[in-house]
Amino acid sequence: MALSLSLFLGGRVRAAVARCGFASQGVAGPGSISREPDPDSDWEPEERELQEVESALKRQKKAMRFQKIRRQMEAPGAPPRTLTWEAMEQIRYLHKEFAESWSVPRLAEGFDVSTDVIRRVLKSKFIPTLEQKLKQDQKVLKKAGITRVVWQLPVSEDTLKPLSAGHPMSGPLLMPGDEVSSNSQTHSRALKVKSNAPSAEAQKKREEKNKRIRVLAESLVPTTTALGHQRELQKYTTHDSEADRRANNHILPSVEKLEELEAGEPGDQNFSSKVVQKGREFFDSNGNFLYRI
């Protein structure tokens, strides 16, 4: 009886060992003998699940090690803020309403920040007060190069009443139709006034510059016109004087002068009454030029 029981258990153990050998052939060493998988074996799916669990654990350990190294390399505490509260509300709104088109990488590219910053914004549930928002936004804008002070903006009680009522804000969101709290509305108005101030000053400077240019141009136009008229008059005067001088040089002699030349003067011994014509020019007998026709 004992012999038969030992033989039966030995056969079961050998069969189990054989099945384990067939199932573990995929993870055997380089020197092991390859065997064909047993189609009737029940160990193959279990072995596959075990390998998947092991790979998942390895990936998790690798990610945890990477996070630990990154925390050690970064400065302690929260990273410096680079987004205003209005920008963070836009990020949450776009990711919530248009998750397919506005993914985390696209939001990071659109707002010029890293994907870690976008994930921190989406994960955060902190709701600050109005003073905290203004103070943090002032730090962000000051770091970005905008030195306008928001605290100097006059805020009256009449202005704060509709804000506390929670009216919808038509601020410069990327997608319209969103309703935000009174804190974000006050912050939006403060940012709008602050962003419009430099543009208004620049516009005023451009208008003053254009006005000075127009006045200078208008003052130069009459002077230029007068100089042009003066040059034209000088040109025509010079032309007329040259024409008169040429006409005086080439003008025909009068009839009296011709008669005197032909009759001759008795007191002039060098004068000859003979006139010689050469082409259109007339000379006396001595060869002196008289006139030209």
UniProtKB/Swiss-Prot annotation:
Forms a regulatory protein-RNA complex, consisting of RCC1L, NGRN, RPUSD3, RPUSD4, TRUB2, FASTKD2 and 16S mt-rRNA. Interacts with 16S mt-rRNA; this interaction is direct. It holds the Pfam family Neugrin. The modification Phosphoserine is found at S41. Keywords: Developmental protein, Differentiation, Glycoprotein, Membrane, Mitochondrion, Nucleus, Phosphoprotein, Secreted, Signal. GO terms for biological process: cell differentiation; mitochondrial ribosome assembly; positive regulation of mitochondrial translation. It comes from the Eukaryota. Residues 25-48, 162-211 are annotated as: Disordered. This is Neugrin. Belongs to the neugrin family. InterPro entries: NGRN/Rrg9. Residues 1-15 form the signal peptide. GO terms for cellular component: extracellular region; mitochondrial matrix; mitochondrial membrane; nucleus. The lineage of its organism: Eukaryota, Metazoa, Chordata, Craniata, Vertebrata. GO terms for molecular function: rRNA binding. It is found in: Nucleus; Secreted; Mitochondrion membrane. Plays an essential role in mitochondrial ribosome biogenesis. As a component of a functional protein-RNA module, consisting of RCC1L, NGRN, RPUSD3, RPUSD4, TRUB2, FASTKD2 and 16S mitochondrial ribosomal RNA (16S mt-rRNA), controls 16S mt-rRNA abundance and is required for intra-mitochondrial translation of core subunits of the oxidative phosphorylation system. Glycans are attached at N270.
